[in-house]
Amino acid sequence: PELAFDEIEGLGPNGGFTNSICHVDHALKASVSFEEFCKNPKPIVVGAVQGASCFGPAYEFTFILDTELRRRKIRDKVPMTFVTAEPYIGHLGLDGVGDTKGLLESEMREHHIKWMTSTRVKKVEDGKMHVEEVNPDGSVKTAAELPFGFSMMLPAFRGIKPLMGVEGLVNPRGFVLVDKHQQNPTYKNVFSVGVCVAIPPMGPSPVPCGVPKTGFMIESMVTATALNIGAMLRGQAPRHQGTWNAVCLADFGDSGVAFVAQPQIPPRNVNWASSGKWVHAAKIAFEKYFIRKMRKGESEPFYETAALNMLGISKLKQVITD
């Protein structure tokens, strides 16, 4: 997708005043900015703007910053504020998973991080962010100017220009419409997977919130799509459906939060979340395992499939046929 930095004045790393971690080059630039910031610590503002759908990395980045500032012995010089479009902390675009609200609020209190929810960013200036907290009825609750020396705000996403405005193919934001088989209802030869898929929001919220597309969920989309294309090539109708299950490890630098949502979109069969230092260790182990797997060219080794099956986590729904 496209990163819609241009929808908010002053947002983004290219000509704006905030950083991003959406691309490798953005992350490298953010690292340089952070090193400069540490020479002269000031307030930090991190979060996700209106229309964003990828909230998890904003939480991870916030707590990883907190951990790094403590390691450098300058955390006491840096007030931190988390600004998000979510109606509550831990919503994640999913109306929460398990007790992510309680877990993440507790972590923020423990780490002295203030937060603002149902908040839209009006514009960003050099060292100053203009925001509005919004009431449930859509009226402005409070307007504020947040000073910062370093900021990372995740933007909203939108579809790519070649697809924009194609009736029956995409929604108004340019995301591809699909049915339960990942197939576009109008253009039967078009399948879509990943971030470009159109998923309705969980429900009305004072400030627009998108729905995230997580890694395992996307793998389930890809699995179903590959099998359905194969079926069509054999003259059969598509019948495979991805589970859209979510298995996530959010690393907080020295601890973290893990959650399992089956499926990711409620109502769910499994709705579990937990936290602790074990999540940090598990995330490091998974990253090393995943990189090794990719280098070897293995998408899903048999032992990974066996482990997921043992945990009752699958990529495909069981489809009953006559």
Model-based region annotation:
Residues 49, 85-87, 195:
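Cofactor-binding loop segments of dinucleotide-utilizing enzymes, especially the Rossmann-like FAD-
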Residues 240-258:
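Flavin (FAD/FMN) cofactor-binding core of flavoprotein oxidoreductases
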